[in-house]
């Protein structure tokens, strides 16, 4: 018997009602922007506009910016994303209304103890973490960490020298990723790991496990489509971060803390010690001021998660830009040689005060902002420049698109460090250049990241020149991943400075 004829009329009516209800549920928010005359790509039921992300967030945002203008609407599943590019609106969201409306970032899925991390936490909890952790990123504390980081700069130089002597091209992300992990694990936990020469060290393996989180993972994608699944996953103890890595760092932090509390000797400055000091110096250990062991673990892990990609990818992009612009590379080397004659060891002050080095790094971050986007969750109904934004929506700022807008940056695809010279820097609108965000919830580790990257660049530029080779992709193409990455790994020829550079 035919299945269709076997079903009664009542069954067909019931199925039709279910389908209509499912459609209504899957499109219930999709009329929000259309009613207000805000343009944007047409959303699909349940999916919204997320299928467009297969192009790459950066590319999709550029297409929308060119097609729709200053504002447009997107939907991550049911989640409305109101996209803004006007500097005054950006200022309202990231600064003026930060504490009252746009305090938090949106949830991306079940995160377990990482809900206690400064970059994920919300409202009063986030304010408390920010107040406790801000003193650990002062210039005084960073100066104390500088010698620790410098030793990994020396290891980096030694490794590159070995590769250069072999005449082999070097995959930048592999080498600079190892440098980043070494710096972050050392300054976060006080652990000396030479991951360039010990890639299978358990600490390195667990740190890399944290870094394998993919925002296009089916688990994360399911939460985008069905936000109500997040508490279900949390209840089932399902987490987007690898459990074995989380457990490893929890036990490690507890062991390190006990060891340091038992020991009377003075420990070197690292973030773990500074967080312990914040705990121990609190007048009332049960007060809101003290950091718990779980909170210390969460901050330590997020330093790895947030710091690795920014540092290693930005350094890779920088060396690519220098290799393909030998005149700029030569000018940077001249500044470094003049500031530090005869390969003198750098200091915190010399590294942070070199003007052309700062210009080169800022221009790289303009061309290649690793995060692509800034987002803030709307925690109550609000009107923003005449547009109604309901509670539960997200406001999104497309950093990559803003950094490549020819109205603000002439010849935006060209690598021109002079944009950030003393003469030109003052004319840059701070709400159009935000590689680390801006306002109260900007990246707390920005100064640390700059120090780490400037030190690495100083060390390698003192000793090497970089050239394109047969494996170098020119022009560089970007991948479709969530964070900004090259389509193919950046591979360059490393030439010791006593060898004449032949140009690109």
From Swiss-Prot:
<dbReference type="InterPro" id="IPR008072">
    <property type="entry name" value="Cyt_P450_E_CYP3A"/>
</dbReference>
<keyword id="KW-0503">Monooxygenase</keyword>
<comment type="similarity">
    <text>Belongs to the cytochrome P450 family.</text>
</comment>
<feature type="binding site" description="axial binding residue">
    <location>
        <position position="443"/>
    </location>
    <ligand>
        <name>heme</name>
    </ligand>
</feature>
<keyword id="KW-0560">Oxidoreductase</keyword>
<keyword id="KW-0472">Membrane</keyword>
<keyword id="KW-0408">Iron</keyword>
<dbReference type="Pfam" id="PF00067">
    <property type="entry name" value="p450"/>
</dbReference>
<dbReference type="InterPro" id="IPR001128">
    <property type="entry name" value="Cyt_P450"/>
</dbReference>
<dbReference type="InterPro" id="IPR036396">
    <property type="entry name" value="Cyt_P450_sf"/>
</dbReference>
<keyword id="KW-0349">Heme</keyword>
<keyword id="KW-0256">Endoplasmic reticulum</keyword>
<dbReference type="GO" id="GO:0009617">
    <property type="term" value="P:response to bacterium"/>
</dbReference>
<dbReference type="InterPro" id="IPR050705">
    <property type="entry name" value="Cytochrome_P450_3A"/>
</dbReference>
<dbReference type="GO" id="GO:0016712">
    <property type="term" value="F:oxidoreductase activity, acting on paired donors, with incorporation or reduction of molecular oxygen, reduced flavin or flavoprotein as one donor, and incorporation of one atom of oxygen"/>
</dbReference>
<dbReference type="GO" id="GO:0005789">
    <property type="term" value="C:endoplasmic reticulum membrane"/>
</dbReference>
<keyword id="KW-0492">Microsome</keyword>
<dbReference type="GO" id="GO:0005506">
    <property type="term" value="F:iron ion binding"/>
</dbReference>
<dbReference type="GO" id="GO:0010468">
    <property type="term" value="P:regulation of gene expression"/>
</dbReference>
<keyword id="KW-0479">Metal-binding</keyword>
<dbReference type="InterPro" id="IPR002402">
    <property type="entry name" value="Cyt_P450_E_grp-II"/>
</dbReference>
<dbReference type="GO" id="GO:0020037">
    <property type="term" value="F:heme binding"/>
</dbReference>
<dbReference type="InterPro" id="IPR017972">
    <property type="entry name" value="Cyt_P450_CS"/>
</dbReference>
<protein>
    <recommendedName>
        <fullName>Cytochrome P450 3A41</fullName>
        <ecNumber>1.14.14.1</ecNumber>
    </recommendedName>
</protein>
């Amino acid at each position: 018997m035919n299945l269709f004829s076997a079903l009664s009329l009542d069954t067909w009516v019931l199925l039709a009602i279910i389908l209509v209800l499912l459609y209504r549920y899957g499109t219930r928010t999709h009329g929000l922007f259309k009613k207000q005359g805000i343009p944007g790509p047409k959303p699909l039921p349940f999916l919204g506009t997320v299928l467009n992300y297969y192009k790459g967030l950066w590319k999709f945002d550029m297409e929308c910016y060119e097609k729709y203008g200053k504002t447009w609407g997107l939907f991550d599943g049911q989640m409305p994303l109101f996209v803004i590019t006007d500097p005054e609106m950006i200022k309202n969201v990231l600064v003026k209304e930060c504490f009252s409306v746009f305090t938090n970032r949106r949830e991306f899925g079940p995160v377990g103890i990482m809900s206690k991390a400064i970059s994920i936490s919300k409202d009063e909890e986030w304010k408390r973490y920010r107040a406790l952790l801000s003193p650990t990123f002062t210039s005084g504390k960073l100066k104390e960490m500088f010698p620790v980081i410098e030793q990994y700069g020396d290891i980096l130089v030694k490794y590159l020298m070995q590769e250069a002597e072999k005449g082999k091209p070097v995959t930048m992300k592999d080498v600079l990723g190892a440098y980043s992990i070494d710096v972050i694990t050392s300054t976060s936990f006080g652990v000396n790991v030479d991951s360039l020469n010990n890639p299978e060290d358990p600490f390195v393996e667990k740190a890399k496990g944290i870094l394998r989180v993919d925002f296009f993972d089916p688990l994360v994608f399911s939460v985008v489509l069905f936000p109500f699944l997040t508490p279900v996953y949390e209840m089932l103890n399902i987490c987007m971060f690898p459990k074995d890595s989380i457990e490893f760092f929890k036990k490690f932090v507890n062991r390190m803390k006990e060891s340091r509390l038992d020991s009377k000797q003075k420990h070197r400055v690292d973030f773990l010690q500074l967080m312990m000091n914040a705990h121990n110096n609190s007048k009332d250990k049960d007060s809101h001021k003290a950091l718990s062991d779980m909170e210390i673990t969460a901050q330590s892990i997020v330093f790895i998660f947030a710091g690795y990609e920014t540092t290693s990818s930005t350094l890779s992009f920088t060396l690519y830009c220098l290799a393909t612009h030998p005149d700029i590379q030569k000018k940077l080397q001249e500044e470094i040689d003049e500031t530090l004659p005869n390969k003198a060891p750098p200091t915190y002050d010399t590294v942070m005060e070199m003007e052309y080095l700062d210009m080169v790094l800022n221009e790289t971050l303009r061309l290649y902002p690793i995060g692509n986007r800034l987002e803030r969750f709307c925690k109550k109904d609000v009107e923003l420049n005449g547009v109604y934004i309901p509670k539960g929506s997200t406001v999104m700022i497309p950093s990559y698109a803003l950094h490549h807008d020819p109205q603000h940056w002439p010849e935006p695809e060209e690598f021109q460090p002079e944009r950030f010279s003393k003469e030109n820097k003052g004319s840059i609108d701070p709400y159009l250049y935000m590689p680390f965000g801006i306002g109260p919830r900007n990246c707390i580790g920005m100064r640390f990241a700059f120090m780490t990257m400037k030190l690495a660049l100083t060390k390698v530029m003192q000793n090497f020149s970089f050239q394109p080779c047969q494996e170098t992709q020119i022009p560089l193409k970007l991948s479709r991943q969530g964070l900004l990455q090259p389509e193919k790994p950046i591979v360059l020829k490393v030439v010791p400075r006593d060898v004449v550079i032949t140009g690109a």
